[in-house]
Amino acid sequence: GTGIFADWEYEQNSAVSESLSVRNKVYGFEPGTARPDYFLYYNATKVAQIGMEDPTELWFKGEWTWSTFDQWVKEAKNKLAADEYPIDCGYAEFIIGAAPAQGNKLVNASRGAVMFAKSSVTSIFDKMKAFYKEGYWDPKHGVQDVSTNFKAGKTLIHTGSLWFLKESTRFTPAEEEGGIQFKIGMVPYPMADDSVVNVHTAPYSYIDTSGNTVEVTEPILGRNGEALKTKTGETIYGVDLSESSYLVPFTGGAN
């Protein structure tokens, strides 16, 4: 048959279009709605058992920053066994998530450039190397999507995607043979230390990506089942990142 390229109007996330473009023409299309889900997944059961603060709770308090992450990792290592590690992440996956979370775009589509040489990005690479060299990063993490040590409960934080949770060959569900027998928590990558985060301490509303108004009337619950509180005792309902430098991987936005 004969192939023909023709102009076609199609709406999709601009970041998807940019990644599939050649000379300002889009040649790839993603069916359905794009849903960025680039998060860190962690052994919430073990985090609680060793007395560490829950990463998701720190996020909703607006405290899950790069320096907090650094301190958290080091404190966790001191509470783990010698053959256990706080970080068990894919190296490429980690930089793809960590760099945007601190306000860095890794790709400039208009120039066709990959921006790995920016000092704000190379500093993240340097920190990753330091984590590995100083014994905070599991040296046995290979190219597999989910490591054996994470599934065995010997590491705390892992890279992944939402679909891993129900997938037999990834975060194998507990009811399946060889399934993970602990609660998995999920948290965005840590923000820049100077990122502006506004915590909602009362019910609020927002507009979702489909243009619908969503009313938030229930507070965020902590791992103890009680409403999460700020340091001054106010109830937390959510966080507002609109004034922050935080970027969602693959979208270039904070929403």
Task: State what each model feature region is.
Residues 1-12, 49-50, 156-157, 176-179, ...:
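Extracytoplasmic "Venus flytrap"/periplasmic binding protein-like
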Residues 45-59:
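Aromatic-glycine-rich donor-binding/catalytic loop that engages nucleotide-sugar donors
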Residues 1-11, 58-61, 104-123, 194-200:
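Short, solvent-exposed loop/beta-turn-alpha elements that line the ligand-binding surface or hinge
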Residues 16-40, 48, 65-114:
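Extracytoplasmic/periplasmic solute-binding protein
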Residues 175-255:
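Extracytoplasmic/periplasmic substrate-recognition and gating elements
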